[in-house]
Regions:
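Short amphipathic alpha-helices and their capping/turn segments at secondary-structure boundaries
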Residues: 39-51, 83, 168-178
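Histidine-rich, glycine-flanked metal-binding segment
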Residues: 1-4, 10-57
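Histidine/acidic-residue-rich, glycine-tolerant segments that coordinate divalent metal ions
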Residues: 100-111, 116-178
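Short strand->helix junction
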Residues: 11, 17, 72, 160-161
Length: 178
């Protein structure tokens, strides 16, 4: 179903403009005014008056910790509650820190985080990957992590998952190659 948000102020990276927004299904299909939007709409299009409202794109929260067990405790939100709260605040994408615990491969850690998130999220999501048990096998996994969509890695310098300075240097040197 199509919907036009009519008469709002669209806020973007280059400023704000008074415009209408056409939504087709779950996607923004067009931003424009007047005749252009009338041409794109059909008789079934729902018109929503948003005069005086600011229209923002969905926000991205690139630093979340859902269902994380660390330092003898568990974070307050899991993927269901955390993403519900995110959506209510205008966030449409989160990037959570998948964690490799001691003795796990990075692939195991990523698989565990997917199991925690899959089917429970109210918004789009991706992962960073925390490296806490560095060894030659984990080093060889970094290319596979990139292919799986992991483009950033976290190293804890505190808590029970911390890595020492020498290990940080080794990991950064290896990541430079990836």
């Amino acid at each position: 179903m199509k919907k036009v948000l009519k008469g709002g102020t669209v806020v973007g990276g280059s400023g704000s403009v008074r415009a209408d927004v056409l939504i087709d299904g779950e996607k923004v299909a067009a931003v424009g005014t007047g005749e252009e939007m009338e041409r794109l709409a059909d008789e079934d299009t729902q018109i929503v008056d948003v005069e005086g409202c600011l229209l923002f794109p969905g926000f991205i929260d690139a630093h979340t910790h859902f269902d994380l067990h660390v330092a003898g405790t568990v974070t307050a939100d899991d993927f269901a509650t955390g993403t519900r709260a995110a959506v209510r605040g205008g966030t449409t994408t989160i990037v959570d820190f998948g964690t490799q615990y001691e003795g796990e491969s990075l692939a195991d850690g990523l698989r565990n985080w997917h199991e925690k998130a899959d089917g429970k999220c109210s918004c789009d999501y991706g992962f960073h990957m925390s490296i806490s048990d560095w060894n030659p096998s984990v080093s060889r996994e970094l290319d596979d992590m990139m292919e799986a969509g992991i483009t950033s890695f976290k190293l804890y310098m505190t808590y029970d998952t911390q890595v020492d300075d020498k290990t940080i240097f080794e990991i950064l040197r290896r990541l430079k190659e990836v």
